[in-house]
Amino acid sequence: MSKKRIIFVLLYCDGFFCLSRNFKLQRIGDFRWLQRNYNFNYSATFIDELIILDISRKSRDINKFATLLYNLSENIFVPITAGGGIRSFEDAKVLFENGADKVCLNTSLIQCPHVSEKISSVYGQQSLVASIDFKHDHGDFKFFIDNGLIEVQYNIQELISFLDPLPFCEILLQSVDRDGTGTGFDLTLANTFRDQLSKPIILLGGAGHSDHLVEGLLHQSTDAVATAHLLNFVGDGLKLSREQAQRHSEVSLARWPLLSSTSFSTTKH
């Protein structure tokens, strides 16, 4: 039985971490706030991976984002995927050089597929995650890029045909409708994408508590579940969720030894 994963997502916007609901943002605090109020690297011992997305609505500063990524990666010992605003190979290179193990592409995946090909040629296909944002639409689906602002003019089969030849290792399926609602994952597309693309599926959008994470892990077509709900899961939330999932014999999670709690470093060493 292959190991499934629990992933936490940090949403970064214009210098602050945020909560998101249907892609509308609520500012929570900056890096120092996260350090002061949550022992995040303790919480990170109960996840399998971390995703950090720059969802800034104004102009993005890739170097500032890379510095944040570097500081986080100093004391977190799980693989890190970084994404948001990657428009070129050079953008991705900066993130890899500052702690990213993988990069996540959304807008450039659709608008500039040559970027994914260049990244893959240097860092390998296993370094790329395809991010797909979707909404329900009268029994069908709509797909979006650029923080949900631009609709992709593909139906589901056209999108799958477009993605099929691209070099990426897994798919992050994010429900805009469920984002931040705490009502559970939208599982409707997992089977279709998994069956037709034969890529691991990460679900994001809707997890409000540990039962939702377990439900997603139990789904036959999902390989990982992710949550960006900072207030619900940081602290003991991720620990309790992992323990609950491990009580299900159908869910195979890696068992990590508990790492000692250390404080964040806010500067490079």
Curated annotation (Swiss-Prot):
Belongs to the HisA/HisF family. This is Putative imidazole glycerol phosphate synthase subunit hisF2. It is found in: Cytoplasm. Its EC number is 4.3.2.10. Heterodimer of HisH and HisF. Gene3D superfamilies: Aldolase class I. GO terms for molecular function: imidazoleglycerol-phosphate synthase activity; lyase activity. GO terms for cellular component: cytoplasm. The active site is at D133. It catalyses: 5-[(5-phospho-1-deoxy-D-ribulos-1-ylimino)methylamino]-1-(5-phospho-beta-D-ribosyl)imidazole-4-carboxamide + L-glutamine = D-erythro-1-(imidazol-4-yl)glycerol 3-phosphate + 5-amino-1-(5-phospho-beta-D-ribosyl)imidazole-4-carboxamide + L-glutamate + H(+).
